[in-house]
Amino acid sequence: MQLEKMITEGSNAASAEIDRVSTLEMCRIINDEDKTVPLAVERVLPDIAAAIDVIHAQVSGGGRLIYLGAGTSGRLGILDASECPPTYGVKPGLVVGLIAGGEYAIQHAVEGAEDSREGGVNDLKNIGLTAQDVVVGIAASGRTPYVIAGLEYARQLGCRTVGISCNPGSAVSTTAEFAITPVVGAEVVTGSSRMKAGTAQKLVLNMLSTGLMIKSGKVFGNLMVDVVATNEKLHVRQVNIVKNATGCNAEQAEAALIACERNCKTAIVMVLKNLDAAEAKKRLDQHGGFIRQVLDKE
């Protein structure tokens, strides 16, 4: 696909005079364009749901979720991956973000990194990619060689693959087994795909990782019951989670958390089933960590 023919490289008539308007009008133009992004994502919800189901199946079987991207796309993958351990208590490495150019590229532009097909393959080899893993290639344009080569290598290994881009029929979309293509149209600043395209990608990644964690029993109701208390704010959140899940008071919630080494799931089962920490943990283990199964089946 030629660059000049890509939707993400097109000229946006709504912002053609943006350099001549007031600051407030400038903000309104950008905001009006941003409003279209959730609608574009809404149109591809079935594709996102299909990807979540595949990711969950692979991760449940011992695989990992691997994000692969360059520039903004790579940074968004790293951002999403880095939030999973503290939010959901998963081990670092279950969700991995890879960026063309390596760690330095998180904060700096690395010239030519996105054009390296070899880089995409080598980065996946370096993390020991296996057929159990799912590789999600992220590229607003859908033409990034680093991502395309990585997806090709992943498919050769037998991995399930997902391609996220904002141009229909792109190489990323056709290379991956599953395509998620929110078409957000031309950017306010021509070609600046960190804007609407980046926002769309962030929304999609939010759904992929959150959907995976919900289906993995990391959420009870709408509570993040595997949150790790790494600071005072999260200590308070743990207490509130146990309170909201059980109806107990703050003192009871704190006592239960202390008794089970601050594991929200265990504390919730302790309170709701009137169990000690050891028995509550045992029942959770018997039901794969799903609070709802412990409550519904016993």
Curated annotation (Swiss-Prot):
Q: Which residues form the SIS domain?
A: 55-218
The entry's keywords:
Carbohydrate metabolism, Lyase
Molecular function GO terms recorded: carbohydrate derivative binding; carbon-oxygen lyase activity; ether hydrolase activity
* EC number, as in UniProt: 4.2.1.126
Which pathway does the UniProt entry assign to this protein? Amino-sugar metabolism; 1,6-anhydro-N-acetylmuramate degradation; Amino-sugar metabolism; N-acetylmuramate degradation; Cell wall biogenesis; peptidoglycan recycling
Please state the gene responsible for encoding this protein. murQ
The protein, known as: N-acetylmuramic acid 6-phosphate etherase
Q: Which reaction does it catalyse?
A: N-acetyl-D-muramate 6-phosphate + H2O = N-acetyl-D-glucosamine 6-phosphate + (R)-lactate
Q: Which InterPro entries does this chain map to?
A: Etherase_MurQ (IPR005488), Glucokinase_regulatory_CS (IPR005486), MURQ/GCKR (IPR040190), SIS_dom (IPR001347), SIS_dom_sf (IPR046348)
Q: Please name the catalytic residues of this protein.
A: 83, 114
**Which organism's genome codes for this protein?**
Escherichia coli O157:H7
PROSITE patterns named among the record's database cross-references: GCKR, SIS
Induction pattern: Induced by MurNAc 6-phosphate that releases the repressor MurR from the DNA. Repressed by MurR in the absence of MurNAc 6-phosphate.
One further remark on this entry is: A lyase-type mechanism (elimination/hydration) is suggested for the cleavage of the lactyl ether bond of MurNAc 6-phosphate, with the formation of an alpha,beta-unsaturated aldehyde intermediate with (E)-stereochemistry, followed by the syn addition of water to give product.
**Lyase among the record's keywords?**
yes
Name any one Pfam family assigned in the record: GKRP_SIS_N
So what does this one do?
Specifically catalyzes the cleavage of the D-lactyl ether substituent of MurNAc 6-phosphate, producing GlcNAc 6-phosphate and D-lactate. Together with AnmK, is also required for the utilization of anhydro-N-acetylmuramic acid (anhMurNAc) either imported from the medium or derived from its own cell wall murein, and thus plays a role in cell wall recycling.
Family membership: Belongs to the GCKR-like family. MurNAc-6-P etherase subfamily.
Q: How does it assemble?
A: Homodimer.
